[in-house]
UniProtKB/Swiss-Prot annotation:
InterPro entries: CLU-central (IPR033646), CLU_dom (IPR025697), CLU_N (IPR028275), CLU_prot (IPR027523), GSKIP_dom (IPR007967), GSKIP_dom_sf (IPR023231), TPR-like_helical_dom_sf (IPR011990). It is found in: Cytoplasm. One of its GO terms (molecular function) is mRNA binding. It comes from the Eukaryota. GO terms for biological process: intracellular distribution of mitochondria; mitochondrion organization. Signal peptide: none annotated. Gene3D superfamilies: Hypothetical protein (hspc210), Tetratricopeptide repeat domain. This is Clustered mitochondria protein homolog. HAMAP family: CLU (MF_03013). Residues 1-47 are annotated as: Disordered. The lineage of its organism: Eukaryota, Metazoa, Ecdysozoa, Nematoda, Chromadorea. Keywords: Cytoplasm. Belongs to the CLU family. It comes from Caenorhabditis briggsae.
């Protein structure tokens, strides 16, 4: 596939053969940052221009580069580090006209930087920092030849893609083997094998260029040697088993005369050359390195940018190959970097000892954002700092729980420990000093971190935030919840009472307020639908009335830097009254068993629900007001009352102005009594906060018992709005999502997809039990998904409490025992724990706690999960065992196992655990199956508003059928996202998929294939090898592969092009689908239909029939509505049966086809007529076949019995389009396809092939 560099400027770049020609005039391997374009905007005073610059490296030939003048010079530095010819040189500066260029300035601001200028690369003297960076780059380059290490660190920025190991490029000369075409056994329909071994990425043969590179024990250089220019000493062991002692001096690297026990850093007499890089030195002293290094570079170049660029945020995989001692190579540089707890990976880049995260985050957050160019620079800077912060915090969390960081309060209980590391404040998710005692204790403290993060996200979405929030990230690791926050300047030097100038620090008893904060919070409250309200504060026995724009829990603090911060935003959204035991709820909620007991009292409605509820109430208000005024007009006309008719007409003319004012949240200025009366009636109907104007806002404190409200507050109306919003969730949002599941219009694949869909509708995860009750008695595909997620999340809650009480050295054995209790059969406590306990007691002479886990059995763990399900989700499980529950609801055990392991943050060995086999296993898991733990990370995800707006515009254009406009909007959004995020970002795959779909619809299929390929690789690396998104990307990729091959069909052999490149990804998609969910899913039906159609095309009828029947059976089993594609699948089944000689089965299938078409289109539609004609042909052929078989003679040829002409290839692509929901608008190449078919099927079929091509050009498919 082509390089990921095409992501930068896909709209403006000239496209040749599906590749960008914008980046280089040569076919160079650039960094992916060299052509970042930000779209023009009318408000920009300075238009971004594309400039051409010549780079003259210190080694190699000069090359030309095109880049936008708003880029940083640093991007050119990165380009040189990525190029094959210059990647080994790291210590240099860029000079323009003899003057050094600042790396952190924009290109347009550099004096003399014009189109066509030349930049010279000048090598600089080495320092210790430069030498360490150089060795890090050398290590990264040489790693491309090694097996990718998945075992350390547990949470890094390297992720792999399986798609890169699949050969998608068709070869004209290479013939397809039968083994390349037919599916492996584990992807056949009905196969019970769910081995994880196929999930991991196949590794290439190792290319070892050097055995080890290490810092010499003679470091640091003594004083006399420093004065002679020595910087660092390095020991290198080559593949020839020779050890070279190197000196890094200011001028470069050379071989010195030192030996193992002798220090002599002077230059060797045998090799007196000083090299600019270690790579160049090794190429001259090691023949093995000289031979292998070019192969490593070739392997590196073969990887596209999207395959090898690091991810912005830490990523982890839940499966890995077994850790074999032979594969864990010695790496001295790795040892130095990872065992030093104070190192976080950035200090080599930054001046000073530690980074001031808060200052960096706030400075970039406050950067100007008036113009599009300013927003691009601001968003890019803020995103980069935030990503660095999350990466640093992730390392800090692991070091804390490893015990490598000292608490700032070491004398207190471990649960109350707090830490400061690398200028980041860490706290554990426990109730410290009974702060949350009345709200639920530890459960409330745990939940408070999530709701606080939701508040931070909400404030980050404000159009012009005037308040500063803290950098924040949450980590769930080994059963602990750790919160990382940036530190407000001066906060540690003062008492909390002295710091807080707004809000309450004693849970509402005493409240303080500040007029300065009022001015800053007014806009925020307006956008977040928070109702300003007055509360009574008591101080020194005196009551005073204060105004709050937020909850009393929110605290305003002025830092020593003068910035005004707002924190503790856990009550930014209205409370969920359904989970407040004593709260008033609607009658509908009472009928459903609400309110009910919950572990804590901090449950809040989601921001998405608040926005959708307010929009629905606005629509109701407008409709009600208009209806009442028009009813009055009708009444006046019936009474023939001229005065009333005149007043009503005036009221109707004012109506549009009233609606505009309401939608813009302005005061309604009208003196018309009819309008006023209509507004009052509408306000009463929708339960507006005020009786004479439309106001739907929420007082987050209206159900808080700790705060005393002022007498002027109408608490009844305020509470009514909150109750209505909660009822809206039950009566509107949940029924809608359940119906979407039944109609298969929404198709989540795994628990993460399900959570994203629920959140988009404003439905909290705690309502899973309510959804489960509504789908448990249906045949919807969502039933096993929802119910298994309830079990998985309940298991997570139970296991988390166990892990917190488990010593670190027992985590492996406890985890394997817990998994055995859940997925195997364990009837007695762990014998391993008992043995270890006795051994430890004898050795230490004292009793040692072996943990709660040791007493677990299958029955006790399942009982705890059932109790947690009932308590937390309100879903009662009445089966005695997990196996019976899975069988009852058709849940695949491996899918549940995957969900549980991922949600726990456990990395396991990729092998076949045979969980779905009928044989009962006592212990499926051993200690060796547990490789590691990794943190589950939640954080505020910075986003670019401009890209979001362009995506919304593109989606709107798509809904109107304006494909070209939609394509341009999505392309522009991708350009902006690339400018801000770089190439790798979790939101990018979805945009690329949309762009690929639009490109295909517009006939730009090669580009569509390119976009979809990148989307698939990104999804694998950023979201997961087996995520639901990845499966969708694979399934989408297949179609563009087929269409690209279809276009070239007139030039190459059909089989050689089509089969290997399309079937392998399809088999991969089916394997992933089977592993993640199981077979009864609409997407599995789509995958099987694709496979069956392709296999039918190449006359593999027996195998094709299995997949086509599977697709048909799945659609019927899940109750998917009958539509065109089900009719087409049924028709293909009939044709496959006929091709196999089974005419009776063919007639049954085709009758069903005719029934579907008749139901969809009526009796006179062409498809119904064609089906009837085919039925007659089948009947005639069946009679002929039967006669020949009953009365055979010597002239009977079995091949002559099958006279049914298969459909032309173009018609099969028609079927694939419909299966995949693609609308075709004039695909280039169809005329060639029709011509090829004419030659293949003879002149008798010429007109039919032409008709098919014309139909494909013009028909709109469902």
């Amino acid at each position: 596939m082509t390089s990921g560099s095409e992501l930068k400027a896909e709209v403006d770049a000239p496209v040749v053969n599906g590749k960008d020609e914008l980046v280089h005039e040569e076919d160079n391997n650039d960094s992916g940052h060299s052509s970042i374009n930000t779209p023009d905007a009318s408000e920009d005073k300075q238009t971004d221009k594309l400039v051409k610059v010549t780079i003259q490296p210190s080694c190699g030939e000069a090359f030309d580069l095109h880049l936008s003048d708003n880029e940083l010079v640093q991007e050119l530095y990165q380009t040189l580090l990525d190029r094959e010819a210059t990647c080994h040189r790291t210590c240099f500066s860029l000079y323009l006209n003899g003057t050094a260029v600042d790396n952190y300035s924009e290109v347009r601001s550099v004096p003399g930087f014009i189109d066509g200028c030349t930049l010279n690369v000048v090598d600089e003297p080495y320092t210790v920092r430069d030498a360490r960076l150089h060795l890090r780059q050398v290590r990264e380059l040489l790693r491309f030849g090694l097996v990718q290490d998945q075992h350390e660190p547990p949470c890094g920025n390297e992720a792999q893609s399986y798609l890169a190991s699949i050969d998608l490029n068709p070869s004209e000369k290479k013939e397809s083997k039968q083994s390349d075409i037919l599916p492996p056994d584990y992807v056949l329909p009905g196969c019970k094998e769910r081995s994880l071994a196929h999930l991991v990425v196949p590794q290439q043969k190792e290319l070892i260029a050097v055995k080890d590179i290490a810092f010499s024990p003679f470091n640091p250089p003594p004083g006399p040697r420093k004065l002679r220019g020595d910087v660092l000493y390095i020991d290198v062991t080559t593949v020839e088993n020779r050890v070279y002692h190197l000196t890094c001096c200011t001028r470069g690297f050379y071989v010195n005369n030192s030996q193992e026990q002798k220090f002599d850093p002077t230059i060797s007499n045998a090799n007196k050359t000083i090299y600019q890089s270690v790579i160049e030195l090794l190429q001259n002293v090691s023949p093995g390195f000289k031979k292998v290094y070019p192969q490593i570079l070739k392997r590196r170049v073969e990887k596209s940018l999207v395959e090898r660029l690091p991810t912005s945020y830490p990523v982890s995989t839940w499966v890995a190959s077994p850790l074999k001692p032979d594969n864990y190579s010695s790496d001295s540089l790795r040892a130095i970097e990872l065992i030093e707890p104070f190192r976080v990976g950035f200090e080599d880049h930054m001046p000073g000892l530690l980074r001031d995260w808060n200052e960096e985050l706030q400075t970039t957050f406050e950067m100007p954002r008036k113009s599009l160019a300013e927003r691009a620079v601001r968003d890019r800077s803020y995103y980069k700092i935030h990503a660095d912060y999350v990466n640093a915090a992730a390392k800090g969390v692991q070091s804390i729980l490893d015990g490598n960081i000292l608490a700032i309060n070491p004398g207190e209980d471990k649960k109350t420990h707090m830490y400061i590391w690398n200028n980041i404040f860490f706290s554990l998710g426990f109730d410290v000093r009974d702060h949350y005692k009345e709200l639920g204790g530890d459960a409330a403290a745990f939940a408070a971190t999530s709701t606080d993060l939701q508040g931070v996200r909400a404030f980050a979405t404000l159009e012009d935030p005037k308040l500063n929030t803290l950098g924040m990230a949450i980590f769930d690791y080994r059963g602990y919840r750790v919160t990382a926050q940036s530190i407000i300047p001066g906060i540690l030097e003062r008492e909390q009472e002295q710091s807080v100038v707004y809000g309450s620090i004693d849970f509402g008893k005493t409240v303080v307020s500040d007029e300065k904060y009022h001015a800053l919070l007014e806009d925020a409250a307006q956008q977040l639908k928070m109702l300003p309200h007055n509360v009574i504060s008591v101080k020194d026995g005196v009551e005073q009335e204060l105004k709050l724009f937020t909850s009393y829990e929110a605290k305003g603090i002025v830092g020593n830097d003068g910035r005004k911060y707002v924190l503790d935003l856990l009550r930014s959204m209205p409370p969920d009254v359904h989970y407040l035991e004593d709260a008033e709820v609607s009658e509908t909620a009472k009928d459903l068993g609400y309110p009910r007991k919950f572990p804590h009292k901090l449950s809040a409605l989601r921001r998405e629900l608040v926005d959708q509820f307010c929009e629905s109430r606005l629509v109701m208000f407008i409709q009600s007001t208009a209806r009442k005024i028009r009813a009055l007009i009708t009444e006046a006309k019936e009474k023939n009352d001229e005065e009333l008719i005149k007043q009503a007409a005036e009221a109707e003319s004012e109506l549009s102005l009233v609606f505009v004012a309401v939608s813009e949240d302005r005061e309604i200025e009208t003196k018309n009594k009819i309008v006023q009366d209509a507004i009052k009636e509408a306000c009463a109907e929708i339960h507006s906060i005020y009786e004479d104007r439309f106001v739907i806002k929420f007082n987050p404190d209206c159900f808080s018992p700790n705060v005393k409200h002022a007498p002027s507050e109408n608490l009844e109306r305020q509470r009514r709005v909150v109750i209505d919003a909660a009822e809206y969730l039950l009566t509107n949002q949940i029924p809608e999502i359940v119906q979407s599941f039944k109609d298969c219009t929404v198709q989540p694949i795994d628990g993460n997809n399900l959570a994203d869909i629920l959140h988009s509708k404003g439905i909290n995860i705690r309502y899973l039990g309510e959804i489960g009750k509504r789908v448990q008695d249906t045949n919807s595909f969502a039933r096993p998904l929802v119910l298994s997620d309830i079990v998985a999340r309940s298991a997570k809650h139970v296991i988390r409490k166990i892990n917190v009480q488990t010593p670190v050295d027992q985590l492996v054995v406890s985890t394997s025992h817990i998994l055995n209790c859940l997925f195997s059969t364990v009837s007695e406590p762990s014998p391993v724990a008992s043995h270890a306990h006795k051994k430890s007691s004898k050795k230490n002479g004292k009793k040692k706690n072996s943990g709660v886990w040791a007493t677990l059995t299958t029955a006790s763990l399942w009982k705890s999960i059932c109790e947690e399900s009932a308590y937390y989700y309100g879903y009662h499980i009445d089966t005695e065992t997990l196996d019976k529950f899975l069988e009852q609801h058709e849940i695949q055990k491996t899918a549940l196992f995957r969900r549980v392991v991922k949600i726990m943050g456990v990395q396991i060995v990729a092998r076949d655990y045979q969980l779905d086999s009928s044989a009962k296993k006592v212990a499926a898991f051993t200690e060796d199956d547990i490789i590691n733990f990794y943190p589950i990370i939640k954080h505020h995800q910075p986003f670019t508003v401009d890209a979001k707006k362009m995506i919304i515009r593109g989606q709107h254009a798509m809904s109107l059928g304006a494909s070209r406009e939609a394509y341009e909007c999505i392309s522009e959004a991708i350009n902006i996202m690339t400018a801000v995020y770089g190439v790798m970002h979790p939101d990018m795959p979805q945009c690329l998929r949309a762009l690929a779909r639009l490109g295909h619809v517009l006939g730009e299929t090669p580009d569509a294939l390119n976009h979809q390929h990148k989307a698939t690789v990104m999804s694998e690396r950023l979201i997961g090898l087996d995520s639901g998104n990845t499966i969708i990307e694979y399934n989408s990729l297949i179609h563009y592969l087929l269409i690209c091959f279809q276009i070239n069909l007139a030039h190459f052999a059909f089989g050689a092009l089509l089969i290997p490149g399309s079937l392998r990804p399809l088999y991969r998609a089916r394997y992933l689908m089977n592993l993640v969910f199981g077979e009864k899913h609409p997407i599995m039906a789509q995958i099987d239909a694709n496979i069956g159609t392709i296999l039918f095309t190449i006359q593999e009828y027996d195998t094709a029939l299995k997949y086509l029947q599977s697709a048909d059976a799945i659609s019927k089993a899940i109750g998917e509505p009958r539509k065109l594609k089900t009719g087409l699948i049924s028709n293909l089944i009939a044709r496959t049966h006929a091709a196999r000689g089974d005419f009776r089965a063919a007639l049954v299938a085709e009758k069903e086809t005719s029934s579907i078409y008749t139901e969809l289109y009526g009796k006179n539609h062409q498809r119904v007529k064609d089906s009837g004609e085919y039925l007659r042909t089948l009947t005639q052929q069946a009679v002929t076949f039967q006669k020949k078989m009953l009365n055979p003679d010597n002239n009977t040829n079995i091949n002559e019995l099958f006279q049914i002409q298969p459909p032309p290839i173009s018609a099969l692509f028609d079927i694939l389009n419909i299966i995949n929901g693609i609308m075709i608008i004039g695909i280039p190449g169809l005329s060639n396809l029709a011509a090829l078919e004419k030659e293949q099927i003879g002149t008798a079929e010429e007109s039919k092939a032409t008709d098919v091509a014309a139909q494909l050009d013009n028909e709109t498919l469902d």
